[in-house]
């Protein structure tokens, strides 16, 4: 197993290794509980795709978690600061857009391997992978509604295409938790396996792709992802509305309630 080259040395929240020729494995190395993303990690997962794309030694990328969870999403202590700081809000919005479009436009196929929790931005990283593999008992949730903001980071651009509008609306509007097995059943991910099989299967798929005809493989991804690119205006609108929510009373109340471990009290008189 080889270490990754120096181009990745600046990353402190991501670890890199090469488990197979042409395969770069990116492992989340968050210092927070359950792999939650602090501000630095959020920035790094938005920037890594340009470096991967420029690395001629990489044919395929595996994205995986470090420990019992894939990623529990954003750090709400930081997101509370985002509510009150315009510069932080714009930075977070730009990073969110770069994460989504970076994965879509990265020429190299991405294989996601998730065990444990995948929430918010963590779930985005799995669902946007070209091949998404999770344990059957993994726990997924898009929790935007719970914290009083619109589901805006990745869901509107890809969920209706993968699982249909009915399922997308249900899970995004209720923020209900569901398992990896349920995600496979509704076609949100490629496959769900026993927990101990996930990492090996991800490496098997990535190794197979790395041996494929590179131009044909990349062109196949590129053309299929036109389905997502044509939905980019929908994504931009949802992302903007999400961050309007962060600046409003619902976003503040939702995050405060979560941090204070109490039910949120959303006013039904909030202007819309």
Language-model segments: which ranges?
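Terminal peptide-recognition signature
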Residues: 26, 30, 45, 63, ...
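Terminal low-complexity tails and localization/encapsulation signals of metabolic enzymes
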Residues: 1-14, 256-272
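Conserved CoA-thioester-binding segment of acyl-CoA-metabolizing enzymes
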Residues: 1-66, 101
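Glycine- (often His-adjacent) and acidic-residue-rich active-site loop
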Residues: 65-102, 118, 146-148, 230
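Crotonase-fold acyl-CoA enzyme core
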Residues: 101-217, 243, 248-256, 262, ...
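Hydrophobic alpha-helical membrane-association signature
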Residues: 41-44, 92-95, 198, 238
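Short, charged, surface-exposed hinge/linker loops at domain edges
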Residues: 224-229
């Amino acid at each position: 197993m080889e270490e990754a080259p120096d181009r990745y040395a600046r990353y402190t929240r991501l670890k890199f290794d090469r488990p197979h020729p042409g395969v770069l494995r990116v492992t989340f190395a968050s210092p927070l509980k359950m792999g939650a993303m602090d501000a630095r990690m959020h920035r790094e997962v938005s920037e890594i795709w340009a470096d991967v794309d420029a690395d001629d030694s990489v044919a395929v990328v595996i994205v995986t978690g470090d420990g019992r969870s894939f990623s529990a999403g954003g750090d709400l202590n930081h997101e509370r600061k985002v509510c009150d700081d315009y510069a932080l809000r714009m930075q977070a919005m730009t990073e969110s857009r770069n994460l989504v479009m970076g994965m879509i436009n990265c020429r190299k196929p991405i294989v996601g391997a998730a065990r444990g929790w995948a929430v918010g931005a963590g779930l985005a990283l799995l669902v946007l992978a070209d091949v998404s593999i999770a344990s059957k008992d993994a726990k997924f949730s898009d929790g935007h509604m719970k914290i009083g903001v619109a589901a805006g980071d990745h869901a509107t651009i890809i969920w209706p295409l993968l699982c249909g509008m009915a399922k997308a609306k249900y899970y995004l509007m209720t923020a209900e938790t569901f398992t990896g097995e349920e995600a496979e059943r509704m076609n949100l991910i490629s496959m769900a396996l026993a927990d101990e099989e996930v990492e090996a299967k991800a490496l098997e798929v990535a190794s197979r792709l790395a041996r494929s005809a590179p131009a044909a493989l990349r062109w196949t991804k590129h053309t299929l992802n036109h389905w997502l690119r044509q939905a980019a205006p929908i994504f931009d609108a949802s992302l903007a509305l999400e961050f309007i929510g962060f600046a409003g009373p619902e976003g503040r109340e939702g995050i405060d309630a979560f941090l204070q471990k109490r039910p949120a009290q959303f006013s039904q008189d909030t202007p819309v």
